[in-house]
């Protein structure tokens, strides 16, 4: 319901602003003829050139570009190296084992503390 009313409102607003919702008759001459906008002449210079913002082109340093492209290729090859992938896997595995062991130690300490509290209460 809400979507339908929103769509009707948008369509009505569009037709209202454009003024072309419905033509009066087939022979109506009330329409506007196609032509250039009066402000379109503002964008053309006296020399018939368009007035666009000019940007100075920097001189390209091809040697630096070449070094960058080889650097990217070198990085891509490093990422595809299976030896480094295996090393990374084992390093991450060691970190995971360390975190798991720390969690187990904390759980054991909590269990020990609960037993001590239970013994002291009885």
From Swiss-Prot:
The encoding gene is Avh52
Query: Where does the record say this protein resides?
Result: Secreted; Host nucleus
List the GO biological process terms.
symbiont-mediated perturbation of host transcription
**Superkingdom as given in the UniProt entry:** Eukaryota
Its assembly, as annotated, is: Interacts with host acetyl transferase TAP1.
When the coding gene is removed by deletion, what phenotypic consequences does the entry describe? Leads to smaller lesions on soybean seedlings.
Coarse class of the protein's main subcellular location: secreted
Q: Where is this region: TAP1-binding?
A: 69-86
Q: Which InterPro entries match?
A: RXLR
Domain text: The RxLR-dEER motif acts to carry the protein into the host cell cytoplasm through binding to cell surface phosphatidylinositol-3-phosphate. Residues 69 to 86 are required for the interaction with host TAP1 and its re-localization into nuclear speckles.
Q: What does this protein do?
A: Effector that suppresses plant defense responses during the early stages of pathogen infection. Suppresses cell death induced by effectors and PAMPs in plant hosts. Interacts with host acetyltransferase TAP1 and causes TAP1 relocation into the nucleus where it acetylates histones H2A and H3 during early infection, thereby promoting susceptibility of host plant to P.sojae.
Which stretch carries the motif RxLR-dEER? 50-68
Q: What is this protein called?
A: RxLR effector protein Avh52
